[in-house]
Amino acid sequence: MNGDPGESGHIPGARVVAAYKGGSQDIPSSADRVEQYAAEIRAKYGVEIVPDIATLLTKVDAVLLESGDGRAHLSQARPVIAAHKPLFIDKPLASTLEDAREIARLAAEAHVPWFSSSSLRFGAIGASMKFPDVTGVFTWGPGPFEPHHYLDLSWYAVHPIEVLYTIMGRGCVSVTRTAGEFGDVIVGRWADGRLGTVNAVRPYSDYGVVVIRGREVVESRPKASAAVDYRALVVEMVKFFQTGAPPVPNEETLEMFAFMDAAQKSKEQGGKAVSLR
């Protein structure tokens, strides 16, 4: 957005003018990089670094909430919603189902548009594997945990879960989860009888999906590089800020968190089937 308009990857229509650093001291990937990133966007792109969210809100038309820590998102979203600024919240929307629903409730009461998404929804995998006759889906991707996120799948496995919902849509009624040392397998049962499976691989893996269409089985290509391209998501952000129309239904995002909540409870109960709440 802030690059040279002549560059091939430039995205017109919006510009980042100010940022608040934030950061989480108990997450090394946040604490160890926030100062470096702040210095880079200030020097390279002319972004003003401000001391707090309140100051930020006086300088912008819309907000990208890019904190990697889902625990912080509710408290950070509150002032943005109160200021009636359109809001994109990067993954994970929250670290609990309750926080996710509270963000949605506050935004609905204030009539503030918002959305949250993994970049994989709009990348090569998500965009190429949507078919009208899907009867089953198997997705996989990295599944490392952070101990402070109650919904442990929300930390990283949210990516393949987002792909699952991109293809399957809403309608999951129950979830079972089998936990292992090298990964977890989560199976959702949809109300229409379809099954959607996620393999959260540890420590890391590429991304991919297999779609069942009657007798035909389709596997995604490529699995990794194009799948994590962030540009397509940024294009959707700019459209959203211009129109106020979320590219992902809020209800679908909230069901994803109900899916992860049920998966967490299934894990705690030794793999029993748990209904979404």
Regions found by a protein language model. Name each.
Residues 1-83, 105-109, 170, 269, ...:
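N-terminal glycine-/serine-/threonine-rich beta1-alpha1-beta2 phosphate-ribose binding loop
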Residues 51, 89, 116-118, 176-179:
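Short loop/edge segments at beta-strand edges and connector loops
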Residues 61, 84-86, 90-93, 244:
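Alpha-helical hinge/cap motifs
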Residues 88, 93-150, 160:
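A contiguous active-site-proximal alpha/beta segment in oxidoreductase catalytic domains
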Residues 38, 160-161, 230, 234, ...:
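A general structural signal for well-ordered alpha-helical segments in protein cores
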Residues 140-206, 251-258:
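Rossmann-like dinucleotide-binding domain that binds NAD(P)(H)
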Residues 55, 64, 240-277:
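C-terminal helix-rich "cap/oligomerization" subdomain common to oxidoreductases
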Residues 205-245:
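Interdomain hinge/lid region at the active-site interface
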